[in-house]
Design a protein with these regions (language model features):
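Structural motif
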Residues: 54-55, 114, 236
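Membrane-embedded segments
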Residues: 62-149
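Acidic-and-aromatic substrate-binding clefts and catalytic sites of carbohydrate-active enzymes
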Residues: 64-66, 91-96, 212-217, 243-252
Length: 305
């Protein structure tokens, strides 16, 4: 019986080691393809060690949108600054994992002059973003990253790491190559109030604003600011524009931004009602390439220089 147990243990350990070796191999295979920030939704595939950046973006899709469709190269040119975008779209990342990405960024010897945190109200209230299990699916398996995350206070940690490992064994990951559409040209013709109402319900999980979740998110944001400032990084917070103007929870988010600006010595801007031309949007709260360029030139550039 003891011999059987020993054999089972040896087999189990050997299987785990084999899986991890394959995961490491597929990660290396994808990592060596030299991705640009505009060519992947991954952060680690574009983050290098001991690098310096002028700007680092954090947030959800409203942040990541500054890099999609080759917008990354456009705003680097407009601002004349080196940029890393660690914002995560697709409903996969909440404030806590954004904090972890920043911790890992600094732990790898990287530096940033400024962090631009796109403070979308749904990001602050969401109960689903913090427990998304697919947050790290498109991140290569790196032992320092995984080890640090194992020691990081996180919701749904085990499921997130398991999903990360499993995804490395799929054709989708192995065939992940650098790709970006050259420009985002889709545009709206007009504001559709019914669509906006449905979108607000979806963003807030068909419920009222969750103040307990907001308080948790606000605490994480303050930890993020403290971490950045401890590394000599300035922080700029802004609420992004939307064709409909203000999200549900806007005033609460705005008051938080104004409060931390006073308490933490950071900059805060409310840009929610700055872009009302439908031609600048591909949906009611995401700017297309024309919108990203216009917003960066008219509003973002003046506050970052």
């Amino acid at each position: 019986m003891k011999r059987l147990i020993s054999l089972v243990l040896v087999f189990a350990v050997s299987l785990v080691i084999l899986i991890l070796l394959v995961v490491e191999a597929t990660s290396y295979w994808v990592d060596r393809r030299n991705f640009k920030n505009s060519e992947t939704e991954s952060n680690l595939l574009v983050m290098r060690n001991d690098s310096s950046y002028d700007l680092v973006f954090l947030g959800i899709s409203h942040a990541r949108n500054f890099s999609r469709h080759r917008n990354h190269e456009r705003i680097e040119s407009i601002l004349n600054q080196k940029i890393l975008n660690m914002g995560q779209g697709g409903g996969i990342c909440g404030p806590n994992e954004q904090l972890f990405y920043l911790q890992y960024f600094y732990s790898q010897g990287n530096k940033a002059k400024k962090i631009v945190y796109v403070l979308s109200p749904p990001f602050m209230f969401s109960v689903s973003l913090p427990i998304a299990s697919n947050t790290f699916n498109y991140e290569p398996f790196r032992i320092p990253f995984v080890w640090q995350y194992l020691n990081f206070p996180a919701e749904n940690r085990s499921e997130r790491l398991m999903s990360m490992i499993q995804f490395k064994l799929t054709p989708t990951w192995i065939n992940h190559i650098p790709f970006s559409y050259p420009i985002g040209t889709s545009r709206l013709e007009k504001l559709d109030s019914a669509t906006v109402a449905k979108g607000q319900e979806l963003a807030f999980n068909s419920g009222s604003e969750d103040m307990k979740r907001f308080a948790f998110s606000a605490d994480i944001l303050q930890q993020t600011i403290d971490l950045a400032r401890s590394h000599g990084t300035e922080v700029v917070l802004f609420i992004p524009p939307a064709l409909f103007g203000k999200w549900r929870g806007h005033e609460i988010t705005k008051k938080f931004g104004e409060k931390v600006a006073l308490q933490k010595g950071v900059s805060f801007y409310d840009f929610s009602e700055t872009e009302f031309d439908p031609k600048f949007y591909y949906d009611h709260h995401h700017l297309n390439t024309y919108g990203v360029v216009h917003f960066t030139e008219k509003f973002l550039k003046p506050v970052l220089q």
